Amino acid sequence: LTLGMLFDPLSAALGAATGELVFSEIMLGQFGGLGELEKFLTVTIGVYIAGRMVKNPKNHVMVGVAALVGTAAQLFMGMLVDIAKVQFAVEDFEAVAGLPESVFATEGFAFANDLLFSGILFCLLPTLYLVPRLYGKIEPLLGMAPRTAESPVAGLNAKVCIVCVLGFACAVAAEMLASSGTPL
């Protein structure tokens, strides 16, 4: 999130998602093939949205809001995918046999728990500390100018929202195909 707010959000988002895929899935031997595309796309969308929201990286309030919104977007998309898998009978819900409606409560609680604990401890606090301190200091080391409010990558618009929705649709389709066992 920090790099998405300081540099080009799309490049940082793709790098963050690739790093998470390599270091938390492939190196640990937990790579799930097509199923990993859902996580890759939702992480990319979450970091990209957070990076686009920040126009002035010195504004602590906006940095904090963007960090929570980006994290919430990623977690919410994952929650929707999990609910859709149960509701469309692609995957069984083991918690309460015969009661697929209970997935709403279970996934909703998991979303709130992840957002309140992981979102604050591992996203909000480090981002609030790092972004204002690194802004204007790290960019010259890389031969770049610091982002300003006039930067073309600052702000959300309809085009960004449409691309994010299309990316999420691809994530849902990939996870549904992976969960149903459809070979490619």
Predicted regions mapped to residue ranges:
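Alpha-helical membrane segments and adjacent membrane-interface helices in multi-pass membrane proteins
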Residues: 1-52
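Alpha-helical transmembrane segments and their cytosolic interface
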Residues: 102-184
